[in-house]
């Protein structure tokens, strides 16, 4: 497979359209408490290098992933001969300082400066306010606070698209309704197991706002064998959910299709989704991702899964 499909984003970035697969790098920051495993620097750097070599040139990170380790490791690769000539699209996120719970205007500017320094860049193509559900909405949007600060960064040419990235659908909608968002990232709510982001996606499209879907594997359970005790939304799955995933593995097996391929393409084949963020922890996972993205999936399999799961979701 060559480079991922490049979809015409609702907003263009310097003539660079948005690839429909984005490399998620929170695992590459070394976050064992979140994922149940660690990734050391050598493995992280090798993974990022391999992703670029395979044509994955849209990278998502955050100031707080691994206390900045994700960004620093990405920066190590980007500094290597200009990432070997790759045109890399970088998305990062504004976060509070370590151990703090404040994301005011000053902190947004500080967070941007920290991220840019670690990454070794002067400009970020996409910049989000991260997990805004952690903060009071009125404080975030009042004059001089976070929203104004991120808009100023855009006006200064330091960032391209601006938006919010988080898991709370209600909070995402509040920011969408400001009319000031270019892009919204939501995770774990548009998967085979949960379609609850559908109304938000529809409204983003209507408003001309790019929607980015993160965690199509629901934090692992749709990509790993159940014997490995994968997590669902970063928690242990319920017995009912495990039974559903067991059925998915069986039905996919009858068609010779990995469940991970079906789960990935559920997002990547939806034209409303501008890009799908997939967290990857090792070079061989990049190869698996590319195979799953390219795999042919019989329509009959999709129909069977929809008949079983669609009525349960929403």
Task: Name these PLM-found stretches.
Residues 116-136:
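Active-site groove signature of glycoside hydrolases
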Residues 62-71, 97-102, 135-138, 190-195:
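Acidic-and-aromatic substrate-binding clefts and catalytic sites of carbohydrate-active enzymes
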Residues 86-99:
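A short, structured active-site edge motif that brings together acidic residues
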Residues 16-21, 55-57, 84-88, 121-125, ...:
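Short, well-ordered coil/turn segments that N-cap beta-strands
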Residues 2, 132-313:
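Beta/alpha (TIM)-barrel catalytic core signal, keyed to glycine-rich beta->alpha loops juxtaposed to Asp/Glu
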Residues 1-88:
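N-terminal binding-site loop/beta-alpha segment at the start of enzyme catalytic domains
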Residues 37-51, 103-118, 168-174:
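Short, acidic/polar
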Residues 23, 44, 59, 74, ...:
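Conserved, mostly hydrophobic/aromatic
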């Amino acid at each position: 497979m060559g480079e991922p499909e490049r979809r015409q984003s609702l907003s263009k970035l310097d003539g660079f359209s948005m690839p429909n697969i984005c490399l998620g790098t929170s695992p590459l920051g070394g976050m064992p408490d979140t994922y149940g495993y660690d990734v050391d620097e050598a493995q992280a750097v090798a993974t990022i290098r391999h992703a670029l070599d395979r044509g994955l040139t849209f990278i998502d990170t955050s100031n707080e992933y691994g206390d900045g380790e994700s960004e620093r490791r990405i920066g190590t690769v980007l500094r290597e001969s200009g990432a070997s000539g790759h045109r890399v699209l970088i998305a990062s996120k504004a976060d509070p300082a370590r151990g703090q719970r404040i994301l005011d205007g000053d902190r947004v500017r500080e967070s941007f400066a920290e991220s840019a320094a670690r990454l070794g860049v002067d400009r970020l193509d996409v910049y989000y306010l991260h997990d805004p559900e952690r903060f009071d909405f009125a404080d975030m949007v009042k004059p001089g606070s976070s929203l104004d600060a991120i808009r100023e960064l855009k006006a200064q040419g330091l960032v391209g698209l601006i938006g919010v990235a988080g898991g709370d659908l209600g909070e995402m909608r509040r920011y969408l309704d400001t009319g000031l968002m270019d892009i919204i990232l939501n995770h774990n709510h548009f998967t085979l197991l949960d379609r609850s982001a559908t109304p938000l996606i529809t409204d983003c499209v209507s408003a001309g706002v790019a929607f980015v879907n993160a965690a199509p594997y629901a934090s692992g359970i749709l990509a790993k064998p159940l014997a490995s005790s994968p997590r669902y939304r970063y928690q242990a799955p319920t017995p009912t959910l495990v039974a559903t995933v067991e059925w998915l593995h069986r039905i996919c097996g009858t068609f010779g299709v990995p469940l991970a391929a079906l789960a990935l393409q559920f997002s990547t084949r939806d034209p409303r989704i501008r890009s799908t963020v997939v967290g990857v922890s090792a070079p061989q996972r990049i190869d698996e991702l590319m195979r799953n993205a390219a795999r042919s999936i019989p329509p009959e399999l999709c129909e069977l899964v929809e008949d079983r799961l669609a009525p349960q979701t929403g």
